[in-house]
Amino acid sequence: MDSWLLSLLIAGVVFAIFQLRTVGQRPAGCPPGPPTLPIIGNLHQIPNKNTHVQFKKWADEYGPVYSLVLGTTIMIVLSSDAAIKDLTRGVESTHRAQICISVPWQAAGFAWSLCDTWRQFRKLFHSFTHLGAAKSYVPYQDLESTSMMVSLLDNPDLVFDHIRRFTTSLSTQMIYGFRTPRTDDPMLLQMYDGFEKWSTLIGAGPAKLLDVFPVLRSLPAAIRPLYSHALALQKKKSELSFGLWQDAKRKVEDKTSKPCFCVGLVQAQAEEGLTDHVAGMIASSALEAGSDTTASTLTGFLQAMVLYPAAQKSAQASIDRACADRFPTIADMDNPETQYIHACVKESLRWMPTTILGVPHAVTVDDEYMGYRIPKGAGVVYNVWAVHMDPRRYPNPRAFDPTRYMQDLASSAESAQNSDVSQRDHFAFGAGRRICVGMHVVDRSMFLVIARLMWAFDISKAVDVDGDDFVGGILVRPRPFPVKITPRSESRAAKVREAWAACQVLLDQGQQWKQVPEGMPFTTYTGGD
């Protein structure tokens, strides 16, 4: 071998060894964190289950801003309200971190970066969910929550299926223009199966390796079975998303659609040149955002009612003062007597935050905070659990105690805009420019369901329940548990059935809306405004 070639080879090996020596080390100036090991950094310390518990322990030890070294990746963990507010200013950390395994699930990453498609999605979805638009969906929320109540009378053992059907049917009606009237609907089952498989997959050890060692992504597919599995899941998701979009688009063009998000999306496609692929994924993302997380939060509320019967009695007394023997309606939101119900909504979102560690974001420019260096490309995680379990913000934080919000009259959106972040109600909807724009819809849906549940039913435990037993990965929910749901009285059960009977005149034989609900606009899309 020529001496120059040998020298080049030796130099390459030395350089590679030198580079490997730095992998797994915490860069100078970064926030503190647990000790690292060569190559893997802190990867071995990240538990596969109950990650939020360990992240909270590290926050207690290292402070509100700490760092984790995950192979070649730096993760900055924000564990206080002030840190989350300060580090979500402007555009510095608004890109979503690209999680390798989730890229195919997210349609090759379209939703993960601050790009034109993301801006289009935000603009479209805001026009669809702002306060004025949210109020127009009351007929949908009223019918779906009434359907859920009568289903609980008929089949109380399927309570968690009824919750999922409620949130899914409300979402498909608002987004695509059709109801999902059955708990065994194939689309519903496929969607939630995909949610669960993806959430489990993204938290798996091999998936983490692909994230923290990008070089592994170039390995042959045959030795990356997890990534191939993700591609297979994405293929099923794309087929479902594209089919739902094409059907909704056809109905809009045929003028047979009901008012929904896709009416505006068809207009936006023509005006802004969106492809069918992008339009379908935008609609699908809206569906996912509106169904799974709300279902998990409502499941958490049920669990809280089992664990904290005194809170249930207070909620029932609140709605009884407001409604007496009248079936609750959305108008009861404005009744001062229902403040405890509003407090239950806020406390449910605090006590059971489904995005328990937020959604990973990425810093787009070098930054500095509290004297620490925040390097460009670092992942940023909002440690929502740590903030929600901070006893300085919420005394006795693991207790479900709606009274902590009895003086809080602000909506979620109003609270998120409060310049004093210490007064914000919770961080379940995120922060910064990526905050959930569907807050108005969620607040109203949860109020109506909780008010009607508390008015119509007693909720009690069938067996002992562990309030800290969660399942899932990126998105979590309480592990399913036996619960006993019984009508508070025969007269109230009859009132529920009367309300559902009144809804039947609105529906055809397929349980779809016969006509456009009175006063509901076909679209709230405002074009390029």
UniProtKB/Swiss-Prot annotation:
Keywords attached to this entry: Heme, Iron, Membrane, Metal-binding, Monooxygenase, Oxidoreductase, Transmembrane, Transmembrane helix
Transmembrane annotation, as ranges: 4-24
EC number: 1.-.-.-
Keyword Protein biosynthesis in annotation: no
Location of the protein in the cell: Membrane
An annotated GO cellular component: membrane
PROSITE patterns: CYTOCHROME_P450
Top class in the EC scheme: oxidoreductase
Pfam families, A to Z: p450
Function: Cytochrome P450 monooxygenase; part of the gene cluster that mediates the biosynthesis of the enfumafungin-type antibiotic fuscoatroside. Four enzymes are sufficient to produce fuscoatroside: the terpene cyclase-glycosyl transferase fusion protein fsoAthe cytochrome P450 monoxygenases fsoD and fsoE, and the acetyltransferase fsoF; the cytochrome P450 monooxygenase fsoB and the glucose oxidase-like protein fsoC do not seem to play a role in biosynthesis of fuscoatroside.
Name used for this protein in its record: Cytochrome P450 monooxygenase fsoB
Organism: Humicola fuscoatra
